[in-house]
Amino acid sequence: MKLAVREAVASDIPALQSLIRASVLGLQAADYTPEQLEQALERVFGVDTQLIADGTYFVAEAHVDDGPVIAACGGWSKRKTLYGSDHCAGREDALLDPRHDAAKIRAFFVHPVWARRGIGSKILEVCEAAAVQAGFRRFEMGATLTGVPLYLARGYVEREHRQVPLSSGLSLPIVHMEKHL
């Protein structure tokens, strides 16, 4: 399998939306209820176009017989927002100061067909390297329960468990994780 990681562009958004839905429903069902997943897809998970505009969101394209297919996506941010798509409440688009703040690792999703092949780790390496190039020496994220094992294996530590409010009294458990260089 030939794999290439590149910056996401606006024309990728429809494919990213499909990928995110497939990833959430196909890989996170063991950690969350169907109701949590559907509400999270409406309120939390999805494309953050600010990451694409900032040039800090990446896609991994697998080159198959029919041409390139987006197998995974993920990014980092120099902004205060820790998680969430364009329609997530509580967004903070203010810029971070790399001398004092941690870069945010954001919105990692792998299509179930391409899961557990090291693609998420590859995108994470690209994101961390880009954040370091921008002057950051610390990283943090709001990880899904499904993603925690990957991030632990990549040197992140759990800081606290949090609940992201959804609707109808539901919430989405996530784990605040950090990594220092």
Question: Which sequence ranges carry the predicted segments?
Answer:
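Conserved N-terminal entry element of GNAT/NAT acetyltransferase domains
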Residues: 1-14
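Conserved GNAT-fold acetyl-CoA-binding loop/helix
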Residues: 21-47
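Conserved acyl-donor/pantetheine-binding loop and adjacent beta-alpha core of acyl/acetyltransferases
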Residues: 54, 68-115, 125, 130, ...
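Hydrophobic beta-strand residues of extracellular immunoglobulin-like
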Residues: 56-60
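Core beta-strand residues in small-molecule sensory/regulatory alpha/beta domains
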Residues: 61-65
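Conserved active-site alpha-helix within GNAT-family acetyltransferase domains
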Residues: 117, 121, 133, 145-161, ...
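Conserved GNAT acetyl-CoA-binding A-motif
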Residues: 124, 131-144
